[in-house]
Amino acid sequence: MSVKLMKDLDLKGKRVLIRQDLNVPIKDGNITSDVRIQASLPTIKLAVEAGAKVLLMSHLGRPTEGEYEEQFSLKPVAARLTELLGKDVAVVKDWEAGVELADGDVALLENVRFNKGEKKDDEALSKAYAALCDVFVMDAFGTAHRAQASTHGVAKFAPVACAGPLLAGELDALEKALANPARPMVALVGGAKVSTKLTVLDALSKVCDILVVGGGISNTFVASQGYEVGQSLYEKDLIPEAKRLREETEVVFATDCRVTTVPFDQWSDDSPTEIRKADEVKADEEIIDYGPESAERVAQILKEAKTILWNGPCGVFEYDAFAEGTKVTAQAIADSEAFSLAGGGDTLAAIDKYNLADKISYISTGGGAFLEYVEGKKLPAVAMLETRAAE
């Protein structure tokens, strides 16, 4: 990765503008999960300890661009940062004329999405951000796939543009899993639809030794063998793609399934289920998880892996009745000696549910950015940092 790194720069007395992902869930003015704020702390502390004048920026929610809306204000985030850093962090609403800070001070610009032109990567807005700093630090991997003024444009015009520790860590982990993986490399991809993950499956099939599919994706592969899948979620039109992938790489999917006849609007933690061989599913049944044989087989594959990339659950794990497959495979990843990289919202929820965060080598904070990187797409914000580093 040929980008400048914040840790290599002398920041003493410099105005340092850090783009972070502080887009946290807020209910009735209270932050319900501060995971992203906690993740941003090492970068902020590094800049403060280096004697920089630290200015932070982030988006929050989806306000109407160009309009101030109190519910999307970053004030609760600033209050939490003040607590965690033990120093006052003010929210700056009117920053165009510049922000006066002493060395070691920290302030937070108000929600970047209140600024007209943010999403369009507006040049004038990008230059206005750039004028606030001597060094711009991109540290928000979760927004690196968007070319916007606070992620991409500002990096173009800032005197110096570099990657923060969080972004650099993400890129290193992705490179370790995808560019030069220790083998065997196993990719576990779950989720509802083949269509939304087809490019991911394609890209991973070229890198991994074994491609394991779960969830609704597995159902489409089961159907590609000519088997009945009853009421299960699957994509008939993508059966040819499933067959093609099976020819191109070793694909592992359900050989036995957990099924239910309970309509989905009545699902609960104790919904009744049955176990069926993959070729014995009845017309009125719906596949909602791996059967025990499949889960055990996948767990064994994961146990022998040296690199694991995990994106998506094996079943409808939100309900305990349908969660066993996800639980067994998640535990196998946690117990594995492999370098394991996990990403995507549902995956993080599963890691949370089974309390496995400290057993996964690297957990990616970016949903869309994670998938686009896996697909082999260039992330605009990272590409801009590379361009600036080459100057």
Curated annotation (Swiss-Prot):
GO MF assignments: ADP binding; ATP binding; phosphoglycerate kinase activity
Binding site for ATP: 197, 318, 344-347
UniProt keyword list: ATP-binding, Cytoplasm, Glycolysis, Kinase, Nucleotide-binding, Transferase
Pathway the protein acts in: Carbohydrate degradation; glycolysis; pyruvate from D-glyceraldehyde 3-phosphate: step 2/5
Class of the enzyme per the UniProt entry, highest EC level: transferase
InterPro entries named among the record's database cross-references: Phosphoglycerate_kinase (IPR001576), Phosphoglycerate_kinase_CS (IPR015911), Phosphoglycerate_kinase_N (IPR015824), Phosphoglycerate_kinase_sf (IPR036043)
Gene Ontology biological process terms in this record: gluconeogenesis; glycolytic process
Similarity annotation: Belongs to the phosphoglycerate kinase family.
The protein, known as: Phosphoglycerate kinase
Gene name in the database record: pgk
